Amino acid sequence: MLLIPAIDLKDGQCVRLKQGDMDQATIFHEEPAVMARHWVDRGARRLHLVDLNGAFAGKPKNEDAIRAIIEEVGGEIPVQLGGGIRDLNTIERYLDDGLEYVIIGTAAVKNPGFLLEACTAFGGHIIVGLDAKDGKVATDGWSKLTGHEVADLARKFEDYGCESIIYTDIGRDGMLQGINIEATVRLARAVKIPVIASGGLSNLGDIEALCEVEDEGIEGVICGRAIYSGDLDFAAAQTHADRLRESDDA
């Protein structure tokens, strides 16, 4: 089970939001690259970046901070980024800068043809981010709820050739209420590509619950507020997850 620290970027700083509300941002560090180094030193094997300003503006807004993070740790572990990615030129630029994965969310839902083009042009580097509430997909920084069922879109995008799917339960994100295991497993069973869980991770119990269903196709989990607030010790959690996997394999 891959534990992936999230670095959410707003106005060049590392922040956390509650339920995607830009007005409820807590600043955790003014230098995101320093935060990235911290998580790598604590044992992170991948980083998850979100350009929050970009997600709402529909175009990149924190490129300097993103490049600084890539320069700091991109040569050591894969870095993935979502938020404000709406065209192939932006994807190409980010991949050239050293990103390993680009996450397409709203643009994939609103313009599936763009996602197909991206998967065709940059195979192996495109992740789809599906954000949902009560099984329905949300777009535009979670501000708009669509009528699309998560599983239906996931299967469609899998056929396009995306690398994996990040599934975020909007109702739980930033609330430390626990991962929605049932909904995550349901989605993982609907597709053959890996699913990464997101939204609500709160403690070791969540990690253990995810490890129990890892073989359903759940590759990892995004770690947000819990590792910043101290509710979850990231290094200890990743070590614990690795040990659980080793015991299962024994």
Curated annotation (Swiss-Prot):
GO cellular component terms given for this protein: cytoplasm
One GO MF term: 1-(5-phosphoribosyl)-5-[(5-phosphoribosylamino)methylideneamino]imidazole-4-carboxamide isomerase activity
Keyword Metal-binding: no
Coiled coil: none
Keyword Ubl conjugation listed: no
Record InterPro entries: Aldolase_TIM, His_biosynth, HisA_bact_arch, Isoase_HisA-like, Isoase_HisA-like_bact, RibuloseP-bd_barrel
Biological processes per GO annotation: L-histidine biosynthetic process; L-tryptophan biosynthetic process
Record's keyword terms, sorted: Amino-acid biosynthesis, Cytoplasm, Histidine biosynthesis, Isomerase
Enzyme Commission identifier(s): 5.3.1.16
Involved pathway(s): Amino-acid biosynthesis; L-histidine biosynthesis; L-histidine from 5-phospho-alpha-D-ribose 1-diphosphate: step 4/9
Location(s), subcellular: Cytoplasm
Protein name: 1-(5-phosphoribosyl)-5-[(5-phosphoribosylamino)methylideneamino] imidazole-4-carboxamide isomerase
Species: Paraburkholderia phymatum (strain DSM 17167 / CIP 108236 / LMG 21445 / STM815)
